[in-house]
């Protein structure tokens, strides 16, 4: 995902104030979310996959809170993806907005043709 598209998604989230079947929001203000594995599994088993955006606090009116440490968060996301069978290979993107970092993990859908 390009930086421009990521920033557009952040703006869209502020307008819609909701998740969708292919978009999950996680706050990640102090650490990597504990229930990430379930979301990774769910998105990887959908035809279209999905996007997880970290740094949005949906419990606090979808406030753009940013993530605790973008580098460490990416490492922990990849570690959880490597534990899955089959292994999930996310495309990770980091953007900065209003001096806060946000991370997007694009999770590819399953390829049933294999």
Ranges and model annotations:
Residues 1-114:
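Conserved N-terminal catalytic/coupling substructures associated with nucleotide/phosphate chemistry
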